[in-house]
Amino acid sequence: ATHLPTDSLIEFVHHFPFVLPELQAVGVRCTEVLVKRLPPRPDLGHLKKQAKTLLAQARAGDAAALARLAPLALPAGTDLRLHHTQWCLAREHGFASWPQFQAFVLARRALADDPQRSLATWLRWVYAGDIAGGADNARPEVAARLLDEGLVSLPADDPWIACAVGDIAVLQRASAQDVGWLHRAGGPLALPPLVAVAHSSLLRLPGWRERLHACARWLV
């Protein structure tokens, strides 16, 4: 591997060209996206070790390691820490932060360990614990990513699930068959339709917000 003098590390990281997703935290944009894929049963412990290894390599001046850190656009003179390399791994897999990435890894592992409960597991990321049960916070970015990657299969004509994702066409079909469902709690979490829409954490995501708002307007 090629090595650089210690005093050149941060300058190298700061100026090395890169191709990765939009870096919202530092205001950097690019036109091409390269996102790494996880195995079917990702191991969070292994990923943590990868972050530690990357940190050691970068501190040693390894050019390949520093090139991976370049998208972080760290200020010159930054003392590289573990949270920097964890953030790097998260970015490489298409996540804005390590906590988001960690949550996705745990969710994907849970789906792999118990595929029969995939819908119930997914709903725990859509709704906070006060709705879905437990003490966990909702993770809309995780729920959306699981859908995008085809890791969760939703019932096609369940109107309460449609409320969670803002599928107004399903709501309209359900009402044409039985208008009474609008006033009943139902679905896996036994929620009234409007509650299922209003408490869906997918409302926080721009790509989902308008469709959920449309469902809420239609329900009222």
Region spans (language model):
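Ankyrin-repeat boundary/"N-cap" motif
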Residues: 114-133, 154-164, 182-206
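Ankyrin repeat domain, specifically the short helix-to-loop turn at the C-terminus of the second helix
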Residues: 144-152, 173-181, 214-220
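Short alpha-helical "patches" and their helix-cap loops
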Residues: 4, 101-110, 176, 214
